[in-house]
Amino acid sequence: MAKSFTGRKRIRKSFGRIPEVTRMPNLIEVQRSSYDHFLQMDVPPEKRANVGLQEVFRSVFPIKDFSERAVLDFVRYELEQPKYDVEECQQRGMTFAAPLKVTLRLTVFDVDEDTGLRSIRDIKEQDVYMGDMPLMTANGTFIINGTERVIVSQMHRSPGVFFDHDKGKTHSSGKYLFAARVIPYRGSWLDFEFDAKDIVYVRIDRRRKLPATTLLYALDGADSAELRAERRALGKDLLPYEAQGMAKEEILGYFYETITYQRAADGWKTGFDAERMKGQKLLTDLVDARTGEVLASRDTKLTPRLIRKLQDQGLQEIKVAIEDIIGRYLAIDIIDEKTGEVIYEAGDELSATALERLEKMGVEELPVLNVDHLNIGAYIRNTMAADRNASREDALIDIYRVMRPGEPPTLESAEALFAGLFFDQERYDLSAVGRVKMNARLGFETDDQMRVLRKEDILKILKILVELKDGRGEIDDIDHLGNRRVRSVGELMENQYRVGLLRMERAIRERMSSVEIDTVMPHDLINAKPAAAAVREFFGSSQLSQFMDQTNPLSEITHKRRLSALGPGGLTRERAGFEVRDVHPTHYGRICPIETPEGPNIGLINSLATYARVNQYGFIESPYRKVIDGRVTDEVVYLSAMEEGRYTVAEANAPLDAGNRFADPLVSCRKGGEYLLVRPDMIDLIDVSPKQLVSVAAALIPFLENDDANRALMGSNMQRQAVPLIKADSPLVGTGMEATVARDSGVTIVTRRAGIVDQVDATRIVIRATEDTDPAAPGVDIYNLLKFQRSNQNTCINQKPLVKVGDRVQKGDIIADGPSTDLGELALGRNVLVAFMPWNGYNFEDSILISERIVRDDVFTSIHIEEFEVMARDTKLGQEEITRDIPNVGEEALKNLDEAGIVYIGAEVRPGDILVGKVTPKGESPMTPEEKLLRAIFGEKASDVRDTSLRLPPGVAGTVVEVRVFSRRGVDKDERALAIERAEIEKLAKDRDDEKAILERSFYTRLKELLLGQTSVSGPKGMKGGETITDETLAGLTRGQWRHISVENDQVMEIIEQTGKVFDDSVQRLQERFENKVEKLQRGDELPPGVMKMVKVFVAVKRKLQPGDKMAGRHGNKGVISRITPIEDMPYLEDGRNVDIVLNPLGVPSRMNVGQILETHLGWAAAGIGRQIGEMLDRMRAATVEAADKARTAEDLKERLRSIYGEAVYESDIAPMSEAQLMELAGNLRRGIPFATPVFDGAREDDICRMLEAAGLDRSGQSTLIDGRTGEPFDRRVTVGYIYMLKLHHLVDDKIHARSIGPYSLVTQQPLGGKAQFGGQRFGEMEVWALEAYGAAYTLQEMLTVKSDDVSGRTKVYEAIVRGDDNFEAGIPESFNVLVKELRSLGLNVELNQRTY
């Protein structure tokens, strides 16, 4: 595979044996595709599919007024260009959104009062502004009020029907009570459940239960259904009293088969049904009805063989004993033919008396239900018997009473309510997913546009429920991923917008009825506030709209790929049981079994697996390669969990031979959640890659297969907390995923088109495009780099160019590194030399001992950017002012401020320093006689403002890197704001000029190519017609004059004109873009109400590694730095190299994360080979080396690389390199050869040994270490090697905090708590007990009074300390006064009598 620009600079040797058949999908595709699907921004309005925003508008509109004289229709919607781009929104605290314009059509009708006919009187169409719709950035995030947010996808239960039982927990007998639940996407839930007496009940929306037959009676009977269909075809409907519900006969006929008994001369007989009687034990003798012969005696079991024998004998009818008929249930109503009276109803039990009466009446045929109470229970019949209702009217009214208790029911209102519950598309929506799931479970093939319930669905659900009770069929597993689906951004937004539009709809309908409809326009009817508020509420405060974790690129990607079971319509932490949180077999390849938070959210928040994608129905799919006749093909199919259950799937690392056939006679496979060994010809699919079952973070852990799962979980979670360091360093031992993560995270800069680098500096890269592109597109790409920007977590975002002027780049190459990336690879930490050994107790309990070299060389130093802002408001007493003129502040404190009172960029600031000077007017206070005297003498007005400057808080010290000044429109900008504006305009002008210069250069080059050799017709002054144009001709003219030359060739003239037009258009577009940006800059800013000016100051803080900082490896091996030891005291190797870090070997065996040891060995080998390459490189670069030796060394180097990388990689990537490229590659490898050991397909033990030998190191991976303090070797050899360590975001500087005095709580007057509030330590109940136990009464009194909430005592102690006196007197704590007031509020007068004894 051809390497990219950065890939050639450092080639990673992979130990993977399984080839990549399919590319990993873009890691943030989940977010992007979902929102694109919702907005359909790039689709012309007339071609938009009925999904997302289009579907929401279509479902709410048309809106009719109450008298149906006017209709408001939706025509189309359009999203205009956003007002500000992403960067402007972040700086100004705005939302990155586009105005949504909706075209609506208002149709007004005339209604003929006599005939009721309607005719159109007027149609008005108009565009209406419906608020702003937030847009997604290229990286899958949203900018809301200036901060970057992510909408997390939600896992919820799929709509559809689910069958379950209570696992015997409800009833004391332990009997299973079965239940079915229909969950729609929107609308009322429908539950069917058995009780302990085996009666089936129904609940609507978890209300009071009703017998299930009540619901069946309320449904249309067969005759009514036909009649309703006929009426609907005519545009009418059945009236409530015309419709008939399901009759008992129809209900019983659906659920049970019928057996017909016929009268015989001496009793009753029935047909011999072989299928029904198979396997039964005879309770009476089996007698042939024709011959009277006993064919089988009682207690005989009817085996298939015996039944076949009876059929062969021609048995057709058998006698039925009277006791067999008694206790059976009638299948139809029995009617007295003389009177027409119903004597027995369908479902009635036949008693001996009833049978006699029927015989007397001369009944010849008796249809009964096939219920044997063994295989078929009489549950529906018993429910019918228990049901008080027997007609449609009773059933509807009963349902109405349950749903609307306390309201008087009428038949019309009851029918309207029932129809609206499950059969009205406005109120009930199964969704396409729900219908697909229901079809699959019930065995229907209904179209997925049928979004409401049907009679057939309800009957089939009941039938399956009854069959489950009878022991047939399986219940559903609700944790199966076929029953859980993902709601991504687009769908969540769609639901939210629908809520907003429905609120709007009510208001529109009322307004249509109240205004003069003939004169209004659509915009007069619409108030878009509810819809805009719904959007704002969703993005601003929904549980699923989260502040993006931007600590490093991996944390961004992981956040966008997160799946949460919490949130609106989801689970809650407290109620989620163990099963929901557990790993399920269907998670394989879809949800990572490793990456989930520790703590209360474990298992509820998950991460999408690397290759997984979400399909159109919201189910997670995983890719598989097809296996045909035992041969693995390269055809890849994506399957959801439901579909996968039908296939036999082999694992990706099953051994294959050269012909891609399975090498073993039996292969380990999985099918339907079970693991089995099967023959190769029975296999249907094979996994695409071994890493498809883990998430991105887990796939970055080398030797994951050698780590315990709990530690792997900690490792994947802690990688997300790694702070970007000043010098990024990609891991020596990686997994091959690093480049993918860096590219997809969006922190690096990826080229949009192929081209040649024209200009490079620290802030931008200019590339001249060489690709043949659309003529309208400019021929130059300018990439602006982010310099020292603050991330959401206060880490530093800084991009560095990787290219030089003249470099050729291809489309998709990485041309600039971002935070935590190194040559286009993710680099979260540093490779450090580690020794596993105890060292004087400094690595007790996972503590980490580090060398001073690490601090000296800034190995783990990071930059953090803190943002401080101050606002100047318009107060009642006057305007606050940002100024350098601050009362009672010396010149020394103002040394860092400019004339506008704002700190300079580059100033070093310490805690307490003024960043922005601000004064606030204070109210006039009465003057003292002295002030009056001073004013009388000097006439000066005493200072009437107080100092409210922005000062640097304690614990922060650093350098000011950026200042932004925002002024309200109409307010004059100060000098600093104008200076910032000028600098910004200059930068924009430089971009414009550079782009224009490149465009001109390419245009005139092209023009010259076209003109040379042509015959001129006319031209500028001094040029004759008819001469051939040469270089000299053109050199004598200015470039601007070339455009005025006309040539004979018409085709060439046409191309010249066309090229000139494209060039002019490009230049004009450039100028327009520049003017637009300048206009935005010069326009005032939109600030919150009452704010006149706002200043933001960004301070960069350099954080060196120090004791108390938390560090970790990638295997969950975390610890806190205990000590920084001088370099000379650290253990060192025999060649004099000191180790950087000493870890405790006891941290490995009990944690079972052996991966870190393997990583150490392989890292040791990588560094050893790197040193060998470095030595060769030094020999090649040495000035004294002769050309022949240099060439020989170069050949040796190539051979060395061939032996390490293998023939295939060498031939494709290294052999074609020029000498300069080879030298650059070798230079990048001297630190160590980067290895990739993909998860579950990584380096084996023999690979590591081979690499150690290649590096000339001991196969054991252990070395002799010498004690730096004594110079004596340690007793045993020590495991030494390179491990990739991360510095985590838990820095001691952010946590350490001290206070003497500070803010106090208003009511209790006790100090506040926490660093953020500058609070104090709480002396709590247990601490009081400790002092009581020691009898330290005075210490205790001091703690509870003057050091806490004795207000007057506090002041007196302060005054005493100032005087140098150390005596104090304790008073009454304020909390005692609070208690007294509390008691008084209860009406108890408590008085405190103070006596001195």
From Swiss-Prot:
Protein keywords: DNA-directed RNA polymerase, Nucleotidyltransferase, Transcription, Transferase
Any coiled-coil regions, as ranges: none
Entry EC number(s): 2.7.7.6
One GO MF term attached to the UniProt entry: DNA-directed RNA polymerase activity
Catalysis: reaction(s): RNA(n) + a ribonucleoside 5'-triphosphate = RNA(n+1) + diphosphate
Gene3D superfamilies in UniProt: 2.40.50.100, 2.40.50.150, 3.90.1100.10, DNA-directed RNA polymerase, beta subunit, external 1 domain, DNA-directed RNA polymerase, subunit 2, domain 6, RNA polymerase alpha subunit dimerisation domain, RNA polymerase Rpb2, domain 2
Listed GO biological process terms: DNA-templated transcription
Cellular component annotations (GO), alphabetically ordered: DNA-directed RNA polymerase complex
Assembly and interaction partners: The RNAP catalytic core consists of 2 alpha, 1 beta, 1 beta' and 1 omega subunit. When a sigma factor is associated with the core the holoenzyme is formed, which can initiate transcription.
Function text: DNA-dependent RNA polymerase catalyzes the transcription of DNA into RNA using the four ribonucleoside triphosphates as substrates.
Protein family (similarity comment): Belongs to the RNA polymerase beta chain family.
Listed name of the protein: DNA-directed RNA polymerase subunit beta
Organism this protein belongs to: Rhodospirillum centenum (strain ATCC 51521 / SW)
